[in-house]
């Protein structure tokens, strides 16, 4: 457990949020297990992945979800028992993470968010009595698992940063070390790490870490890829104005998401995000231009779309995705692309497409969802046995 988390737990205990103060008691395990799910709200990738998992879990379990930001708004439209909390947000400027502003904003909001979130989450958890907590890189559900002593499952892509062996160019070493520190401070000592990824570096601790293909939506599986003349552009933030000027130099039609507007500017068509519309554009696109976000890259790869990746600077997870994307031959990675870079990419689309078709394999989410079902059964059975033994000792 990191010093940061110890401080947070100490703070919660001294503010009356300890497990003894809460008088938390576990209910006997019934046929349907009760799962509390925490979802990070940075971008929509965490929400999209969690949406698939939650839908699966609800077939045999009861699920209560806590999420912030865009994840909350996405999930509340799809499920009941979704509650809003506050969370950490990254500040972007000119397609670059502003680490100073991100840190200062987080420090400023943390004391109030800590109190409000843990109080609200515990009030609901006291009634719901979860047997297991699952976190898709959500900080407060991680803390709650420690306070309540409920088994924690980490399920995300983010831990590929800390729990896989990643060799990167020296110029990204500082970003790597910083990212590792942040990731380790968010989630501590879960029972197991389930990592989703389109690349498979060696695991640092195979006994507690398992890696699976990306979790994809049913709608993606149902799409029929075509090869029309437009190129899809998706941006994590609307700060990359340099890219917009670059695209104007080409004869292609670019359909652009991430700038929060509906507008046509020459060969550029800006669109607000709409799931159905996005699916259609993605499936029929010639290629995809994006940052290094895991979800869009994974969906594009599944649909055999070559990818031109410009990861947000200082965002190491995106940088790592882009490095492996290029290494696998699925597309190209550029920090600061110019016209020649994009021209080269467009000339080699057939090569990248063949590489994807030859090498990428997906199992329809079967392995990871099956693993999750087994884990839930094992952990709840073990928890029930421990509670029975403890009760016998008391009597």
Role assignments for model-derived ranges:
Residues 38-51:
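A short, glycine/small-residue-rich beta-strand->loop->alpha-helix junction that serves as a flexible
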Residues 296-297, 301-353:
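Catalytic binding pocket for nucleotide-activated donors in carbohydrate/polymer assembly enzymes
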